[in-house]
Every structure is written in C-alpha cells, then in structure tokens.
Amino acid sequence: MTGPTNAMITDGTLLVHCSANQALRCAPVAERPGAGLVVSPHQRDEAGLLATAAYLLRQRRFEAPLLLDAARYAGQARLPASAPFNPRWLRRQRELGLPVLTDSGYVDSGDEPGLAGILHRTAVLPGTIAVLPLHPAWLQDRLHRTVLTGHIRAAGVPVALVLEAGRDPFALPGVVEGLLAVLGCGVPTLLLRCDVSALGALCHGAVAAAVGTVAGLRHLTPRTPPPRPGARPHGFRPVAPSAVFRPTLSYRRIGAIARAHRGRPDPELFGCACTVCDGRDVDWMAALSDRDREVPAFEHSIRVLQDLRDELLPRDRPTEQPPGTAARSWTARCADAEYRSRELGWDAAPMLRHWQRHGPTGAAAATRPAA
Ligand SMILES: [Zn+2]
C-alpha cells in the first residue's frame, strides 16, 4: 500500500498512534524501518492536525509512513456511521501525499446500514482506506462477524479497524477470533489504537497496526452515560503511566513493576536493553514523578514493541520464513508471557490466552519458558 508521495506502508508495519500535540516528540521514535505514525487531532482540532502533518512533511522532512485519523468516531460528541465523509478532509490528505483514511463515524452494534454505508462510500473513492470504528460485538458475536466479513469482502477496499472497549478489546472473548476472520477476507487490513495485541495482528497478516502513546489511544473508549440527575460530578483523574513489561507482554504500572522487582531481584527479568533504559532495570522510571515518567515510559514501550516485532517478523529476510512462522512464534511468546505473569504473582493479560486459543495449533505445546 502506498501514498502518492509519503513513504510506503510495507507489510508488518508497527505504527505509533499519537495526538497532534505529541507528533513532533513521537516523530523520531516512528522514523525507523517498518515503523510510522498515525496522528489524531488534539481536542478535536482537525485544522491543527493538518497543519502539524504539513509541518512534519515539509519542514521536518518526516520520511516514514504518516496517517491522519480524524477520530470523529470518538468522544462524547462522536458522529454515527451514517455521517457523510467530509470531502475536504479526504482531499487534504491526498494533497499532502498521504494514504487517505475516511473520517468515519462510529458503527454501533445494531448499525448494519451504517457499516455497509462506510464501505460502499469508500469503494467509489480511489485508493482510500475505510476506517471502521466498531462496537466489539461486530467481532465477538458470530452472527455480527458473518455480516461484517460479508460486507468487507463485497466492498473489497482496505480497512482500518478501531475497536471499542473500556480497556483492552482483545481481553474480550471472541475479539481475537473476529479479527482473524477479518484478516481472512483478503483485503489489506490495518488496526489503529491498539496495544501489545498489535504484534499479534501483524503476525497474523495485518498490513499495519498502531500502538497508542497513552491509554486513551490504545482502544476506543466507550462514551460515558450522562450523569444521573442529582449525581455528584466526578472530576478528571489522570491515569498513572504504564509501560510495556517485556517478559509478560503487557502494559503494567511502573509502581507494580518496581514492587515485583523488590520481591524478585532477577537481573534477567528486569534489565532492559532498549535505547531509553540503556541496560538499566526497567523500573528506574519509578524514581520519576508521574508527569516526568510519561515520555520515557512511552518511548521504552514503543522501542520494546519494535524490537519484538523485528524478532517475530524479521524485516531483512521476510521471504525466508515459511508461512505461519510468525503466528506460531507469537503463540509461543503468549504462552511464555502467561507463565511469567503467574511466576510474578500477577494475573496474566487475558489476551494472552485468547491469542493462544486461536493461534496455530501445536505451537503452545512446543513452548518452553526461557530460563
Ligand atoms: Zn526499556
């Protein structure tokens, strides 16, 4: 898949999903082989997002793949799937030489006309990727899944999925299975707003998957119901930053990693060779304030996920891997991570079990936890 002038999205691309106010800081992290950037508006400012993109491309000479996500499907004022695309939004992406993503509204669980509408309207636009911001029932429920994959096959256009969930959508039963069904439709598939499961998607054939810089960009947060009359408004509570803990393939609070480390001073498990940690134990960030650890936590996480991607899908010799090798390796990594989680006394991330259950058979049996 290519944009007319922006760098090509090659198979197995691991993107960073950030908001426009983070884009300049994220650009260096996203500029390496097999990486790239997805940028969503900061506080719904689409004009600001376009200006940021123009700056990145023209002044900053950003050379990795760049995608713009209008995110009109998100937030309290989100638009429904039936909302028409904004022709100016589509045109501006084209003028910037970028891959074109539709500015789709949200596809609720009962909204088959909305789903079909997005795909039909995309099919008549040359070289455009249909953004599908989905209620998780579209992947979880067998009947929904059949309808979804039927419409995707019929339209035959590339799709970029965004999955709604309070936390990790891949923790929900049926979501991994549903994603694999979409990947089996034979259209180029991207996954936006994701976390560690981005790697699973890439190993199973997604063209690209994007990992969010902050929790709010690692899934589509459901709209909160309006407060009950007379209920006390609860204030905004900032979320303490989490970081990817490589042995358990999961995002963990830095404090939780530090506590586990005190109980088990095992250098093999806690040392991190990423460019941010530079050989230090990963909980070095615990000494920083929540505010100061946000940037290193994000950079560490992206670097670790990029390294894992390179190990699972070696970019220098992709054709040497027999088909299914990456998916089998991913299943084996999930089994190992589940074992490591139990060893540390943590609940394993539920997605680990779902990926193993639906991965290539026999892989888990071949897994031996690393010494
Ligand atoms: Zn690190």
PLM region descriptions:
Residues 18-21, 189-197:
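Glycine-rich beta-to-alpha transition loops that act as phosphate-gripper elements at the mouths
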Residues 201:
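Conserved, mostly hydrophobic/aromatic
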Residues 226-280:
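C-terminal amphipathic alpha-helical segment
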Residues 266-371:
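C-terminal extensions of enzymes
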Residues 172-187:
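Donor nucleotide-activated moiety binding/catalytic core segment of transferases
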Residues 1-166:
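Active-site beta->alpha loop and helix N-cap motifs at the rims of alpha/beta catalytic domains
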Residues 37-40, 206-217:
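Short hydrophobic/aromatic-enriched beta-strand-loop microsegments
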Residues 212-228:
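Catalytic or ion-translocation cores adjacent to nucleophile or general acid/base/metal-coordination motifs
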